[in-house]
């Protein structure tokens, strides 16, 4: 059903003025790293606690930033951010809020949905996470044979896998070495078998995470894990479910269930009980630090003016690159082995949220929306796609992420060298084959460290950036109708093949 709406965002005055600016930029010499070099009164470096955001290598100037902020105000972005955090039903297609921010609101202030305060459930679930993680870490959670847990296996896919996986790897300095941590996400038999050969079922805890508890891949692997135990009584000590449908978990024999709610999207469940494995690994106190980092960014995005608002600036400059400079991909390079899994995490978060061609009014959009997100470990790019970045015919935009704690190491100097080459280019008369045009727009995110607090802040930064872009594009980032349609088609094909 098509809803009535105001005029298209492309008809707004700020949009048309940005188009004129973009035309001027495209006519500008490609040898320039940006339209107007930074002056003393043009600040392109912003900071929130543990993260510095530097956009000095973007092709923007003061005029463009001002117009982008005008665009944000024209689409009522301040109101939309307030609606997100205050629990308004902004997930229009499913008629529900998107309240992942409530999961890390440590003030525990009342948030009402249909007259009910959800924070009591959030706080209660946090307490369950604390109790379970403490029991396991204190060796008081025993398997069926009376031995304490030594291995924790996370069974889930998508948001139920990528978020916990990012944490366990990124926070390796905080992770208890008294336990082994494993992940099973794929229906490929090797995914399950590669883990099972490493564990002893007597001392293993399986966490089965599925919001719907109908996810085919997750339930298939859970049933395989059940088969490791002889009777239902044994399952009690070895399985915990995280789901919005506890009755479905109970039906298959899992008694211990932690809730997630329909107002939390799977890909936004980073701060929920879906991340129980992380609380076990780093301890509940450090898990709260993860929540605190994310919550501080929530506060920052809601109350900081747009000229100093890092998620908003990242989003608006992304809009500029995508919709006005027509660069439809985002390369994310992390210069830390600890952040190896951050790129696939953001890839899902961004492309599943904003990979839409139908707006909130049910109409096809007439402009580009979410970019293709790709990337990986930055230094390894030197030996894979760095050649394309230097001299290829495809234009790219980049987010370069470094740790300040690595400033004395070669890894960060490698990053700075690559940013310089890709933005400023290389011109040499002696070797025409070595010409590099440069002018690649890029952000530089400098993390103070790779602590739980900083990781929480980084994840929230990208969550809010993606939400802000969805507002500009007038799309719903909290549903996934394409995926649901594909699932339905798969069920029909499977049913037909069984007839």
Curated annotation (Swiss-Prot):
One Gene Ontology term of the molecular function aspect: carbohydrate derivative binding
Catalytic activity: alpha-D-glucose 6-phosphate = beta-D-fructose 6-phosphate
E.C. numbers: 5.3.1.9
Source lineage: Bacteria, Pseudomonadati, Pseudomonadota, Gammaproteobacteria, Legionellales
InterPro entries: G6P_Isomerase, Phosphoglucose_isomerase_CS, SIS_dom_sf, SIS_PGI_1, SIS_PGI_2
Organism, as annotated: Legionella pneumophila (strain Lens)
Active site positions, chain numbering: 352, 383, 487
Protein name: Glucose-6-phosphate isomerase
Function recorded in the entry: Catalyzes the reversible isomerization of glucose-6-phosphate to fructose-6-phosphate.
